[in-house]
């Protein structure tokens, strides 16, 4: 377990453990939900022995484990005696907030015997009291939005790179084949001069320098690119602040062969210069070899 970070996520039902674990997954943690406490030492040992060593583990342990949960304090003592280092993240919220969340989700509290939500909350607070006292970090999510909780988790458990971890994909496509279903933003570049109507350029693609020169030489292109890069200089930090981890930019022309390819590659170059993580993919390039794919 040397060098392996073991994070135990626990806390009140409805306090945001599910959202926290999703964020931890985005940060590269290997996450397991509702693992019986007695299995924690063996699980950690197996992770340390894997060929591709798992360096960060997050385990959700809470009262859903029923009678198994009663062993959690003893298990934590055993981990400490064995020299296995761990951290405990405890999430909680006010009764008022938890009641509202349970009503919105229309789910019963797991410890409520009479159907009264507050009864279940108070019973859970009592059951978790000792575990809360061992927590390395307690987060009260009463006034947190999901995005704010994700940002807090990233600040606590992500490195500097993780805090600005946004995986960007720029996809060129042809409108004749449909807009990519996973697109977050769609940019229509069909207003730019079309190389398809130049006989010497028609058989080429946006990967070829003559096509790139043709597209970039147009005054309209120059003005558009200036606006486009300013747009993303503004948008990307906002997405990161909001906790977004993936962003798909779809850039389309008629057939996905010329203009969209040029612009997707250009955008990739610009964002890499700004130290963003971006992959460029040309979805429809080479899809139609009949000469109609423009």
From Swiss-Prot:
UniProt cross-references to SUPFAM superfamilies, sorted A to Z: P-loop containing nucleoside triphosphate hydrolases (SSF52540)
Molecular function GO labels: ATP binding; GTP binding
Keywords, ordered alphabetically: ATP-binding, GTP-binding, Nucleotide-binding
Signal peptide: none
Family as reported in the entry's similarity comment: Belongs to the RapZ-like family.
PANTHER family reported for this sequence: RNASE ADAPTER PROTEIN RAPZ
Role played: Displays ATPase and GTPase activities.
Protein name: Nucleotide-binding protein Daud_0300
Source organism phylogeny: Bacteria, Bacillati, Bacillota, Clostridia, Thermoanaerobacterales
């Amino acid at each position: 377990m040397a060098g392996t970070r073991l994070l135990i996520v626990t806390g009140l039902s409805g306090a945001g453990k599910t959202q926290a674990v999703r964020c931890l997954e985005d940060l590269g943690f290997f996450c397991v939900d509702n693992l019986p406490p007695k299995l924690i030492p063996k699980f950690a040992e197996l992770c340390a022995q894997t060929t591709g060593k798992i360096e960060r583990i997050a385990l959700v342990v809470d009262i859903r484990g029923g009678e198994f949960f009663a062993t959690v304090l003893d298990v934590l003592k055993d981990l400490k005696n064995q020299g296995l280092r761990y951290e405990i993240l405890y999430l909680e919220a006010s009764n008022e907030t938890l009641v509202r969340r349970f009503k919105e989700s229309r789910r019963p509290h797991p410890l409520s015997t009479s159907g009264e939500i507050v009864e279940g909350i108070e019973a859970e607070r009592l059951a978790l009291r000792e575990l809360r006292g061992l927590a390395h970090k307690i987060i009260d999510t009463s006034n947190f939005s999901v995005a704010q909780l994700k940002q807090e988790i990233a600040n606590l458990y992500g490195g500097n790179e993780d805090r600005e971890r946004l995986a960007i994909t720029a996809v060129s496509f042809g409108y004749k084949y449909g807009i990519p279903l996973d697109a977050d933003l769609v940019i229509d570049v069909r207003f730019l001069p079309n190389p398809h109507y130049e006989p010497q350029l028609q058989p080429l693609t946006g990967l070829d320098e003559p096509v790139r020169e043709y597209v970039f030489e147009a005054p309209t292109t120059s003005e558009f690119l200036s606006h486009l890069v300013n747009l993303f200089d503004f948008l990307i930090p906002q997405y990161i602040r909001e906790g977004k981890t993936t962003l798909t930019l779809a850039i389309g022309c008629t057939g996905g062969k010329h203009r969209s390819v040029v612009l997707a590659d250009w955008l990739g170059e610009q964002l890499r210069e700004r130290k963003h993580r971006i992959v460029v993919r040309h979805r429809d390039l080479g899809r139609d070899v009949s000469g109609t794919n423009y």
